[in-house]
Each structure stands twice: as structure tokens, then as C-alpha cells.
């Protein structure tokens, strides 16, 4: 089982929160103290809380659940995309478009448009158009790919959200709450933990910390899926033996 240790978190700087003056009092239970006017997060709480979240995500994946990684700020964007792809899941790593979950019907139409454009760009349709028309369609396709590329093959709403920075992604969290989709989120000392089902108190700005979270989640998801495949294979063997 994918587990993250106290040492891993210390080395990645997970314990460094935001400046004390920007804190959210709701994060008080997870704060160890203050050093140089910066809040220090209590990793003795973060370690078990993160490992519980990993267990949940692994279980969701084992039940063939879809996990949507959300991290649209610069420090998270690349790590979110890489880890989602590595674990064969889905991601939003640019702007969160309002209604991405709660207005899925409209989003699905945009995804269909993106897929149609992708087919047209490859089957020779674009070659029959004028340069200006081709340029406009390519621009439209790039714009749609940037917004929806990470969810175009999701095929419906996700079963769980994994979020980097609860404050920055509050709209995504609110939409998930409205639909009853469980949320795992990295929550820094300046953020509001309300609406997060699995709170992981930790630094949400340091690239090393973000990579630690996303890699651990990708590993947990992959292990969950592999365990299901192994169990299914053993079940099939057992049936054959009978």
C-alpha cells in the first residue's frame, strides 16, 4: 500500500504553511506553531490523514471508480497532469470552468465538438478548407484541448476529486459537494477546509510537496486497480478449477 512517511513530508517541506497573518482559523487544529511568522503544520496529523486519503482513493480505483485530479495553479499544473496520466485517470490543470461538474450536459457537448475537430484534423477535412478557416478551427481545437483535454475520455462524472489547494479550487469543491462526489484536498493554513471529505493539511505551493502528493496518489490508484485485476484473475482461476 502506498504510504508516505514523516521524513518524506519533512524533506518536501509539507510542514511549511502560509504567513501567520493570512491564516484561516478553521485550520487551527492542524497547526503546530509559528516560526518566523510562518505557520508550521503538525505533520503528526498530516501523515495519518494523507495515508487515510490514499487508502480511500486506492479503494475507489479498485472499484473501477474515476478520480479527477484538480490543480490549476502554476505550481500544481504539470504534476497534476503527469500523475493523472500515469495512473490512467483524469485532470483539470488550467482554468476550472464553472459548471464543469454541475453542468455536465453542456460540457459533454463541448467534448464532442473537440473530438469531432480532432477527427477532422486527421481525416483530411481541414485540407479542403481555406487557410483562414483551418487556422480558426485549429485555434478552437487548441482552446478546447487546453480546457477539456484531461477529461475528454472520462465518459461521465468522476467518483472522487483529488484537489491541490482547497482555496484556489473552491468552485470545483463546491460543485462536487452539490453532487455528492467525495473530495480529497490538500488544505494549507490559509484555506477553508469546509466541504473537504478527506482533509490533508499541508503546503500547497512548494513544487516538491505538490509532487509528493500527486505521485503518492497516482501510486495508490495504480495499486488499487492492479489489486482488482489480480483478485479477478484469481477468481477466474478458482472458477475454472471447480
From Swiss-Prot:
Keywords: Ribonucleoprotein, Ribosomal protein. One of its GO terms (cellular component) is cytosolic small ribosomal subunit. InterPro entries: Ribosomal_uS2, Ribosomal_uS2_bac/mit/plastid, Ribosomal_uS2_CS, Ribosomal_uS2_flav_dom_sf. One of its GO terms (biological process) is translation. One of its GO terms (molecular function) is structural constituent of ribosome. It comes from the Bacteria. This is Small ribosomal subunit protein uS2. It comes from Pseudoalteromonas translucida (strain TAC 125). The gene is rpsB.
